[in-house]
């Protein structure tokens, strides 16, 4: 099992002393694990946790753009954009699907970061350690599983 965590470390390393907004589910923001991670970097940057109740559901419904998601993001982000933001960390595995919608709201300024690169690197290390990392140059196969019962949403 490979756990995910918000990409706070890379954000703080890239923007020391910067203002970093972490968009995550309310549960993630409240969790002791997140609070400990935030505390680890509190002295190196201004880290602001933004609980985004309901944002994950936009992704699950396949609503990645449009007026409803734009209104939601504007309402959530506008109060934090009154001052410059250096980085926005996407603290939920669903949120990278909304990168384009978030970019349209925040403009070109803040860098939008997620933890997918770190997860991929950890997966590669674990597969190599267990001798399961594919070494040949031939293409492999991928199997995607989803409990969603709506093929038209999955097709997007």
Segments and roles (model prediction):
Residues 1-156:
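Non-catalytic structural scaffold of enzyme domains
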């Amino acid at each position: 099992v490979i756990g995910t965590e918000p990409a706070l470390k890379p954000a703080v390393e890239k923007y020391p002393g910067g203002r970093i907004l972490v968009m995550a589910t309310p549960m993630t923001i409240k969790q002791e694990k997140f609070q400990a991670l935030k505390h680890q970097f509190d002295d190196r940057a201004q880290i602001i946790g933004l609980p985004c109740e309901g944002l994950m559901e936009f992704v699950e419904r396949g609503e990645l753009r449009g007026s409803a998601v734009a209104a939601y993001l504007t309402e959530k982000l506008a109060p934090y954009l009154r001052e410059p933001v250096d980085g926005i960390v996407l603290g939920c595995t669903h949120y990278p699907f909304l990168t384009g919608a978030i970019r349209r709201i925040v403009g070109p300024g803040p860098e939008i970061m997620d933890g997918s690169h770190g997860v991929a690197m950890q997966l590669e290390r674990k597969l190599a350690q267990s001798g399961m990392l594919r070494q040949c140059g031939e293409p492999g196969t991928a199997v995607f599983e989803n409990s969603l019962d709506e093929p038209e949403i999955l097709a997007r």
